[in-house]
Amino acid sequence: MKKHFLTTLLFLVGFSTLVAQDFSVDANFRTRSEYRHGQGRLFQKEEKPAFFVNQRARLGTSYQNEWLELRLTAQQIFTWGDAQQPQAELKNHLGFFEAWAKMQIDENWNVKLGRQVISYDDERILGGLDWSQYGRFHDAAVISYGDFLNIGLAFNQEGQPNVGNTYNVGSASKNTYKTMQFLRANKKWQDNSLSFLFINNGFQDFDSSGKQDGVSNMQTTGFYGIFPISSLMLEASAYYQFGKFQKTSVLAYQLRAELIYKTQEFTAGLGMEMLSGRDYDDTSAKIKSFNPLYGTAHKFNGHMDFYYLGQNLQGTTGLNDIYAKAIVKFNEKSNLLFMPHIFMSNAKRADNKSYLGTELDFMFTQQFRKDVGLNIGYSHHLPSDAIKTPITHDMQNWFWVQLNIKPTLFTTKQ
């Protein structure tokens, strides 16, 4: 794989000197050291904390002329020390994060084909998940009309069979879809922006013997908007989920609103998000817990990723997240974020305890230069008696340091 990628890269560099309008080679080196003492799950009294360093290494090439744009990005993700020495088989092999071609049909319409990041608006439903070292991509075709309209189509298979089209990569419970279609429209005027999204996901179903048993289609639709109100900015979203998931009817919703006040040196925000859940005594045969699908979950509901990315509340009583944020800007290259959350159950719990806990998130950002940045984060979780057990540790925290280097290695224009 490495040999093939380097051969392709050298070919493109040589080719670019003859015909390219724009050609560039870029890299991304990102390390993150983490101390985990309650990240993603409650830490127990007899457990030992985890510490590790993981790394992302990407090498990308871009080519562009007046009608065609190409992008190839190879990446390898690994944890320091997870391969024995001397060189052995890599646990996480080199693969392509991006491999797409974008063709301009006319001055407005274009089509983008291949492995690509699909990210819109606040990334609540469709996002790049860049916090994850792996990121998130889709193998899809996206037809766009300027910045106004995007239509996406995807059909996934795990190979090239001669018979049948059963899809059994991952599982539906992890939102691995067999088919996806979406339509997103955006309108901007003055300082306002309003987006509409409709997405259909088809999930492969299986019977009790493991044989293919049709496809369940689940739909998600809603709006996202940004609106100025005097000296404030309102950011809001609302989504409704219906259809079927694993042969079960779905009826769920998401609502979020945040007021933001911003100056050159300071940003303050106050918001609330509601993700529907199911009452403990609800006997209806419906899924009522909202599924955030393919968004950047790390941006929402606390940096410790306990409630949704940690899978601790999906399929249960949902979540109400009341939060605030303050960003102090020290200079053009550094700032400090503080973001407290109060978590409550959206639906009724058997113990009648709606308060789930509080999380305090801190993040310092320092940009040393255009292509080198440092992030330092600390989060503290205070779970309530509703989710604690007798063996839950009194201290739930998480500390991390991330260095991100993104240089442009080579560029040529003609």
Named regions from a protein language model:
Residues D22-V25, F51, Q104-V111, L129-K286, ...:
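Signature for the C-terminal beta-barrel architecture of outer-membrane proteins
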Residues R32-G40, I77-Q85, Q116-L129, N156-V169, ...:
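Sequence/structural signature of outer-membrane beta-barrel proteins
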